[in-house]
């Protein structure tokens, strides 16, 4: 239990930031899941649109410190490769 006034304030701030970060992380997961569902359905256009929406969300999460920048880059890279493979197989 926090005893000093500053420790109590820090606890309140941590709780607020935790809620904000949870919301951001959840939003990122939702966007990534939409891309993965579009890939699974085999719809290249829908997958590309979902990927283009997810990319800035991942970058925003990385810039805000919710995700490490390497983690966000890795997710973007892997999703891009899967979307590209889907569009190549759709045109072939």
From Swiss-Prot:
GO biological process: translation
GO molecular function terms attached to this record: small ribosomal subunit rRNA binding; structural constituent of ribosome
Signal peptide (UniProt feature, chain positions): none
Domain of life (superkingdom): Bacteria
Record keywords, A-Z: Ribonucleoprotein, Ribosomal protein, RNA-binding, rRNA-binding
GO cellular component: cytosol; small ribosomal subunit
One Pfam family matching this protein: Ribosomal_S20p
Location of the region described as Disordered in the Swiss-Prot/TrEMBL record: 1-23
Tagged with keyword Ribonucleoprotein: yes
Entries under InterPro entries matching the protein: Ribosomal_bS20 (IPR002583), Ribosomal_bS20_sf (IPR036510)
Function: Binds directly to 16S ribosomal RNA.
NCBIfam families: S20 (TIGR00029)
Family statement drawn from the similarity comment of this UniProt entry: Belongs to the bacterial ribosomal protein bS20 family.
Annotated protein name in UniProt: Small ribosomal subunit protein bS20
Organism of provenance: Rhizobium etli (strain CIAT 652)
Source organism phylogeny: Bacteria, Pseudomonadati, Pseudomonadota, Alphaproteobacteria, Hyphomicrobiales
Primary gene name: rpsT
């Amino acid at each position: 239990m926090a005893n000093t006034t500053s420790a109590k304030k820090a606890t309140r701030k941590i709780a607020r930031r935790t809620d904000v970060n949870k919301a951001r992380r959840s939003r990122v997961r939702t966007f990534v899941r939409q891309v993965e569902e579009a890939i699974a359905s085999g719809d290249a256009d829908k997958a590309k649109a979902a990927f283009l929406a997810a990319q800035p969300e991942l970058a925003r999460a990385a810039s805000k410190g919710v995700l490490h920048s390497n983690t966000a880059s890795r997710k973007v890279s892997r999703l891009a490769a899967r979307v590209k493979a889907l569009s190549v197989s759709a045109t072939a």
